[in-house]
Amino acid sequence: MDVCVRLALWLLWGLLLHQGQSLSHSHSEKATGTSSGANSEESTAAEFCRIDKPLCHSEDEKLSFEAVRNIHKLMDDDANGDVDVEESDEFLREDLNYHDPTVKHSTFHGEDKLISVEDLWKAWKSSEVYNWTVDEVVQWLITYVELPQYEETFRKLQLSGHAMPRLAVTNTTMTGTVLKMTDRSHRQKLQLKALDTVLFGPPLLTRHNHLKDFMLVVSIVIGVGGCWFAYIQNRYSKEHMKKMMKDLEGLHRAEQSLHDLQERLHKAQEEHRTVEVEKVHLEKKLRDEINLAKQEAQRLKELREGTENERSRQKYAEEELEQVREALRKAEKELESHSSWYAPEALQKWLQLTHEVEVQYYNIKKQNAEKQLLVAKEGAEKIKKKRNTLFGTFHVAHSSSLDDVDHKILTAKQALSEVTAALRERLHRWQQIEILCGFQIVNNPGIHSLVAALNIDPSWMGSTRPNPAHFIMTDDVDDMDEEIVSPLSMQSPSLQSSVRQRLTEPQHGLGSQRDLTHSDSESSLHMSDRQRVAPKPPQMSRAADEALNAMTSNGSHRLIEGVHPGSLVEKLPDSPALAKKALLALNHGLDKAHSLMELSPSAPPGGSPHLDSSRSHSPSSPDPDTPSPVGDSRALQASRNTRIPHLAGKKAVAEEDNGSIGEETDSSPGRKKFPLKIFKKPLKK
């Protein structure tokens, strides 16, 4: 018990002793601090009066100067009285947390690399913040410091710009007691913002806030408008390019159609050549058949002449007559298949000249279309090359080259379609003209030969333009359409031979279309009737006169012995109208011959004296022993007109032989009459 009491007393005594020592130590420190504070205040007042004597008696200015001096002391690490560049840079990076203090550093130092307390005070007095009013300080507190809750406190204390340095230093009395800031973060934030404002002046955001906002809004509007404009232009450019590509594809299709038409022309040329070869073979075959028929007729004639039996002679004559009828039937069918009208030769030359002049104008139009096509292609290639560049799309969209190329493509497409349509229409039109006229117009000797043949002044025609060789077409379309298949070459060789003979004999006119009468009283044509008939060539009139003179009262003996049907076939005129007329007359004569043969069965084989006398006095009935001049002239004409020289002589000899087949034909009694109704079919018009 005593031990515990002693221990407690000893501890109490120790505590009292320790407290006494601490109190004595604190009193000594307070005395020392008071004495040092008094000394520092005296030194600060003396320095302030030395630097700024007019303001040294103001207590607020003294407090502000003391705050500026403390700021300078914070920045002066080596305590040499001056703040150099390194010290200020370190202070900005470490204390103010500026990562790029270049602008602030240049603003703080300027041209002076060493900043003293006096320099710092003069810079503060010359600052705009030094002259701030209470309202400006409150505005700075709200906008820059962002502490609007202390606005009333600042207004009550009437803190102006002179008190700003006191806010920039760590002063618990000022911030805690006077401003009543209990939050440490608010005190630190206010200190840093005030320090930045004192050292570097008013913040730029407070002065240029509205301007920057306006510039930002304008920039955003311009950017959005530019993006929208670029989008619209890009879409318009794409649509325009699509349209141009469609037009270009249409131009390619028109060009392809022109190529297809050109290939069709090539095929037509090949078919034309094939038809020409087949036509020559067909002509040769027909000539061979005609020669065989003539040989058979000659054989029957020889058999008839060497037979003494009257029935055998009559039988041979009937067989020969049947062959003649068959030949006449074929000739009639060929004549019925052709038109009865033929244009004159001069019309053919004028139409050929018209075709050549039209070809010249077509070539000019085609050359213009080719030039437009090349220009459009070059423009399209340039547009494609520009699109491959970096700003090619925008350049093409803003320039007028796209519209120009589009217009050129449409113009070239229209011109090419017009040229194609003109080519088709011209080929069809001249084919129809050839069909109606019956001669060839596209295939002609050329414009120079036609001008010379028609005696036209060459200066009227002008100079022909050469065809372009740089175009995509391989051959000249106009040279090909001159070799287009003519409808005349598809027809029978007899028509072509007749057309050829008509071209070589331009003096042949149209024959009379008057039908021959079938009456027995009209044995011969009177002079007045012959004057009413249209003028005929000598060969045509001779053949027609023979057919008409053969139909007399004793026409059976005249037909069989005087004028043989085989010879009349050779003597038929070239004009289809006169040939039909002669065939009808010959057909009617054959019917009358059979009728007279039945009426006079007792006639002698050699014929009556009246028949011989009439034969000798008739100018149209040549003597059997004398060759017919009509046959000779016909043979010479055929030899001149035929295109195959070695067949011309054979044709002439065959015609002379065929002309003498029926000269010795005699009639016999009791023979049946052959119905020849097939020769009386109506003519096709």
Swiss-Prot record:
Effect of residue 108 to I: In TAM1; myoblasts with the mutation have significantly increased clustering of STIM1, regardless of calcium levels, indicating that calcium sensing in the sarcoplasmic reticulum is impaired
Bias (Low complexity) ranges: 490-499, 608-620
One biological process term in Gene Ontology: intracellular calcium ion homeostasis
Residue(s) carrying Phosphothreonine: 504, 517, 665
Effect recorded for residue 481 to A: Decreases fast Ca(2+)-dependent inactivation of ORAI3 channels
InterPro entries: SAM (IPR001660), SAM/pointed_sf (IPR013761), SOAR (IPR032393), STIM (IPR037608), STIM1_SAM (IPR037609)
Outcome of swapping residue 72 to Q: In TAM1; myoblasts with the mutation have significantly increased clustering of STIM1, regardless of calcium levels, indicating that calcium sensing in the sarcoplasmic reticulum is impaired
Required for generation of inwardly rectifying CRAC currents: annotated span: 672-685
Glycosylation sites: 131, 171
Binding site for Ca(2+): 76, 78, 80, 82, 87
All copies of domain SAM, residue ranges: 132-200
Keywords linked to the UniProt accession: Calcium, Calcium transport, Cell membrane, Coiled coil, Cytoplasm, Cytoskeleton, Disease variant, Endoplasmic reticulum, Glycoprotein, Ion transport, Membrane, Metal-binding, Microtubule, Phosphoprotein, Sarcoplasmic reticulum, Signal, Transmembrane, Transmembrane helix, Transport
Region (Disordered): 490-542, 596-685
Compartment(s): Cell membrane; Endoplasmic reticulum membrane; Cytoplasm, Cytoskeleton; Sarcoplasmic reticulum
Extracellular side: 23-213
Residue spans, topological domain Cytoplasmic: 235-685
Signal sequence, renumbered to the chain: 1-22
Coiled-coil region list: 248-442
Disorder cited: Immunodeficiency 10: An immune disorder characterized by recurrent infections, impaired activation and proliferative response of T-cells, decreased T-cell production of cytokines, lymphadenopathy, and normal lymphocytes counts and serum immunoglobulin levels. Additional features include thrombocytopenia, autoimmune hemolytic anemia, myopathy, partial iris hypoplasia, hepatosplenomegaly and defective enamel dentition.
Misc remark: Transfection of STIM1 into cells derived from a rhabdoid tumor and from a rhabdomyosarcoma that do not express detectable levels of STIM1 can induce cell death, suggesting a possible role in the control of rhabdomyosarcomas and rhabdoid tumors.
Assembly: Monomer in the presence of Ca(2+); it oligomerizes in absence of Ca(2+). Forms homooligomers and heterooligomers with STIM2. Interacts with pore-forming subunits of CRAC channels, ORAI1, ORAI2 and ORAI3; this interaction is potentiated upon Ca(2+) store depletion. Interacts (via the transmembrane region and the SOAR/CAD domain) with SPPL3; the interaction promotes the binding of STIM1 to ORAI1. Interacts (via the SOAR/CAD domain) with ORAI1. Interacts with MAPRE1; probably required for targeting to the growing microtubule plus ends.
Domain comment in the entry: The microtubule tip localization signal (MtLS) motif; mediates interaction with MAPRE1 and targeting to the growing microtubule plus ends.
PANTHER family associated with the record: STROMAL INTERACTION MOLECULE 1, STROMAL INTERACTION MOLECULE HOMOLOG
Protein name: Stromal interaction molecule 1
Organism listed in the record: Homo sapiens (Human)
